[in-house]
Structures are given as structure tokens and as C-alpha cells.
């Protein structure tokens, strides 16, 4: 009988200890919290985020504290009325989209990117350039520089890329090669070196002349080379420029690229228009981890809207 009482007492002590242990375990993991996952088996959402390193990129900002959300990207490539379009990755040259990219067309002032590239690669941008009378024989867009005036090469280059004056293009070209014809040959040689083999240039400004042509694909190749040039990139992104004439007068030049003011992601490049070429534009844009170049040729006045839409689509596709 005494043995039975001892056994009952031991059983009660064991049951009490077991109950206490279970309560302590429940206190460690409150009710409603799921069992922890194994370390080598993360939740599906975590694994998905790890495959998209840009998923948490901050929104672009135009001013401190003024954030611009990424544009929504849905559906296919934005429709445009342009005759030719070429979109490439500025770093790799990979084609992102093309439309009649090999169609031979006049390039208008977009070919001034090649003019600027040759001038920049030649160097000596702090050297003086003296304007000659033949430089001023260009219409219709002019800066009205005067024969005999002297400017630094870099100042003329900035004006060329921001406001696109044709007299400045002639001045830089003649100063570089000795004549417009010699500079045009330099343009064709440099284009071939870059791989733009379906183009032929006759003048440095893009005004219409027989035998001058390019294509959206070739211009994207030239634009990539220009985009890789730090001097050119530092200029084409300027929304405006104060140009100081030789007589001391200052003129504010507004960038002809309206996409710079429409899109916070745009950082250049070059506009163009003639009646034969239509509205043309090469524009570049970037976000963290991505740089693209869009070439639009033979468009209407909708070129700004079209290029902005293509730029956003290409950056956030």
C-alpha cells in the first residue's frame, strides 16, 4: 500500500513537470505565429525579389524631396508615326526595338553628333577659333557669329550641341579640317570606323544636299560613341546655356531637345529638322543599371511625345 502511494506521488510530480514545460514552450512562440522555415528554404516572395535586383530602386528625383515615380509599363512598344525608329542599350549596343531601322533617310541636324565627336576627339578644346566669312554662309538656324571674331573651341562646341546653329557647325568643321569637303571625308571615315557603313555625309550640319543620308541604325551607332564621350555627355544634358559673343554680349540659348524638359530620365542628345527629313531626334536616358538611346527619324511634331514614350518604355520594360 505504501508502494502504491509512492508511485501515485511520482506520477503527479511527472505530470506537473510536463505541463509546466509545455506552457513555457507556448510562451516562447505566441499563438498564431507559424513554425519557422528552414534556413535553406526562404519564402517564395524572398526568392523572387532576389532575382530582381532593381525591384527596390528609388524613384527618380528632379529636385531634393521631389520624387517622380517610374512610369507604368504595360502592353507593347508605344505606337509612333515615325518612319524609322531604333532603340539600343547604350552600354552594350543590344537592339531593344527597331522599326525600318535600315531605311536610308536624311538625318538633318542629328548628324551634328558626329561633327561634335570628331571635334572632341581632336582635342585642344581650349584653343581659339577665328570665324571666317565662309562660315557664316549657312541657313536657316544661325548664331550670327561674325567674321574676324574669335572664340574658344569648347564654347562653339557647347553652342552647337545645345542650340544647333549651322554657322557654328561650318566654323568648327573648317577650322578642324581646312575645308567643309575635307571635314565631310573625315566624317565618313569615322562613321566607317564605328561600323556605320550605310551613311554618307557631305556637310557638318545636316542641311539637305544630294548624296547625304544615314539610317536609324547607323545613327544609333554614332550616338553610342558620342554617349561614351564625357565631354559630349556633359553638354547635351544642359537645358540652357549662356553664350558670350566676342563683343561681350550674352545670349541665353535654350536646348532644342524638349524631351529634356518632359522626362526626368532624359539626359541628352540631339534634335534635327528639315522639310525632307521631317522631325528627327536622338535622345538618351538612364536609370540605375540601365542606359538607352532612342533614334526617331521622319516623325511629325509628335516627335517629343513619341520619343518620351519610347524612352520610358525602354528604360522600364
Predicted regions and their residues:
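N-terminal secretory signal peptides that target proteins for export/translocation
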Residues: 1-3
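Bacterial N-terminal signal peptides
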Residues: 9-17
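Boundary at the C-terminal end of the N-terminal hydrophobic targeting segment
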Residues: 20-24
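Active-site-adjacent loops and short helices of periplasmic peptidoglycan-processing enzymes
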Residues: 25-217, 221-230
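Domain-terminus/edge residues, biased toward the C-terminal soluble/receptor-binding domains
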Residues: 197, 208-317
Amino acid at each position: 500500500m505504501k508502494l502504491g502511494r509512492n508511485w501515485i506521488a511520482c506520477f503527479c510530480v511527472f505530470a506537473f513537470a510536463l505541463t509546466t514545460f509545455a506552457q513555457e514552450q507556448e510562451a516562447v512562440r505566441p499563438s498564431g505565429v507559424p513554425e519557422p522555415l528552414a534556413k535553406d528554404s526562404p519564402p517564395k516572395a524572398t526568392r523572387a525579389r532576389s532575382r530582381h535586383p532593381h525591384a527596390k530602386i528609388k524613384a527618380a528625383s528632379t529636385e531634393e524631396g521631389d520624387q517622380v515615380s517610374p512610369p507604368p509599363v504595360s502592353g507593347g512598344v508605344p505606337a509612333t508615326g515615325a518612319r524609322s525608329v531604333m532603340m539600343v542599350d547604350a552600354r552594350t549596343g543590344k537592339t531593344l526595338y527597331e522599326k525600318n531601322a535600315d531605311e536610308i533617310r536624311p538625318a538633318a541636324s542629328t548628324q551634328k553628333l558626329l561633327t561634335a565627336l570628331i571635334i572632341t576627339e581632336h582635342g585642344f578644346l581650349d584653343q581659339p577659333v577665328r570665324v571666317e566669312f565662309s562660315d557664316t554662309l549657312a541657313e536657316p538656324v544661325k548664331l550670327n557669329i561674325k567674321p574676324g571674331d574669335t572664340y574658344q573651341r569648347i564654347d562653339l562646341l557647347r553652342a552647337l550641341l545645345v542650340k544647333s546653329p549651322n554657322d557654328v557647325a561650318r566654323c568648327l568643321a573648317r577650322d578642324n579640317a581646312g575645308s567643309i569637303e575635307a571635314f565631310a571625308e573625315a566624317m565618313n571615315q569615322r562613321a566607317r570606323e564605328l561600323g556605320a557603313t550605310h551613311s554618307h555625309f557631305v556637310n557638318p550640319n545636316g542641311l539637305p544636299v544630294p548624296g547625304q543620308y544615314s539610317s536609324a541604325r547607323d545613327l544609333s551607332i554614332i550616338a553610342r560613341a558620342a554617349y561614351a564621350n564625357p565631354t559630349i555627355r556633359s553638354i547635351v544634358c544642359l537645358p540652357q546655356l549662356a553664350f558670350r559673343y566676342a563683343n561681350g554680349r550674352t545670349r541665353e540659348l535654350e536646348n532644342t531637345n524638349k524631351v529634356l524638359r518632359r522626362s526626368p530620365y532624359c539626359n541628352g542628345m540631339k534634335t534635327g529638322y528639315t522639310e525632307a527629313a521631317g522631325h528627327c531626334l536622338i535622345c538618351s536616358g538612364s536609370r540605375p543599371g540601365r542606359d538607352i538611346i532612342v533614334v526617331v527619324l521622319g516623325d511629325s511634331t509628335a516627335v517629343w511625345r513619341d520619343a518620351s514614350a519610347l524612352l520610358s518604355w525602354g528604360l522600364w520594360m
